Amino acid sequence: LLEIKLLHSVPLNSKIVMVRGTSVQSETNIEFEHYNLAPQKIMNDLLNRAKLVISRSGYSSIMDYKTLGTPAILIPTPGQTEQEYLAKYLNDNPQFKMVNQKDISPEMFNWLSISNSGKQKGPIKLNEGALINSLNNVGLTIPT
């Protein structure tokens, strides 16, 4: 399960907020601010403050990140050829980094991101706060 893999990969000193993207209650112990579903206003606020997003590589989500200039680690849903194609295509863009679900690890948080907007330069520091949007709409953002 992607949610569990992400939770085990996030550095322990991280301040994060999780948006799970489902009304189904989590079976994992989430010890930080989290939402099963977030109202659009809250999601907009979190995305506008984000330094980093970790997300599935769906078209609409990618368009949001591109518009905002937010660096994103894209994790395509296994077997979803459109998501796999989009993540591979964008992997050459310095704003995006593709990570396969099987390759999720703490090391992916060391990714250096220089977005086109200059919003983030240098190493991503998770202890500045983060948002994880998991399951169907997985994403991790670091609010400023």
Residue ranges and their predicted role:
Residues 27-29, 44-48, 83-88, 107-109:
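Short, charged, surface-exposed secondary-structure boundary motifs
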Residues 41-42, 61, 107-108, 130:
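Short acidic active-site motifs
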Residues 1-52:
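Donor-nucleotide binding loops and adjacent catalytic segments primarily
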Residues 109-144:
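C-terminal amphipathic helix plus adjacent low-complexity
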Residues 16, 72, 97-98:
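Hydrophobic beta-strand scaffold residues
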Residues 21, 37-41, 77-82, 103:
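Short, acidic/turn-prone active-site loops that include or flank metal/cofactor-
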Residues 42-85:
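A donor-sugar binding/catalytic signature common to diverse glycosyltransferases
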